[in-house]
Amino acid sequence: MAEANLDPVFQIQRVYLKDVSLEQPNSPEILLNQEQPGVDIQLGVDAKPVADGMFEVTVTATVHTKIADKTVFLVEAKQAGIFEIRNMQTDQLGAILGIACPQIVYPYLRSNVADVIQRGGFPPVHMAEINFQAMYEQQQAEAATPQIIV
C-alpha cells in the first residue's frame, strides 16, 4: 500500500496579466500642460481557491496622475498567479497567500504598469518595492481589532 505524500507543496503554475487599462480622458489638451502631475498609487491583494490545492493570487494596482483636478492618465492593472499549495497548516497558508505569492507576482505587475504608461506616451512610473509581510501583518492586526458600532 502506497503512503500518501504529506510533504508541503508550493509551486508556481502560471503568472499572467489578468487585466489592464489605460485612460487618458483629457488628452491631447492635458499633454500641453507643463505642470508636474501628482501621482496616487493604490495596491490590493486578493487570493481565492480555484481547484483542490490550487489558488489564484491577484495583485491589483491603480495609478492615477492628475494636474489640479484633471486626470492626466489612469492605469488599472491586475497581475495574477496560479499556485499549487498543499499540505500546509492554515496559519502558514494565509501567510503564503498574503506574502510569498504577492512577492512573486508583484515584479511582473510593476513592469507591465511601467510599460503601459510608457507606451501611452508618458515617462514610466516606477512603483516602489512593497513589503508584503508588513502589509499582511497590518491587515491581520486590523482584522483582529474589535469593531465598535455606536
From Swiss-Prot:
The keyword Chaperone applies. Its main location: cytoplasm. SUPFAM superfamilies: SecB-like. One of its GO terms (biological process) is protein transport. It is found in: Cytoplasm. Disulfide bonds: none annotated. One of the proteins required for the normal export of preproteins out of the cell cytoplasm. It is a molecular chaperone that binds to a subset of precursor proteins, maintaining them in a translocation-competent state. It also specifically binds to its receptor SecA. Belongs to the SecB family. This is Protein-export protein SecB. It comes from Polaromonas sp. (strain JS666 / ATCC BAA-500).
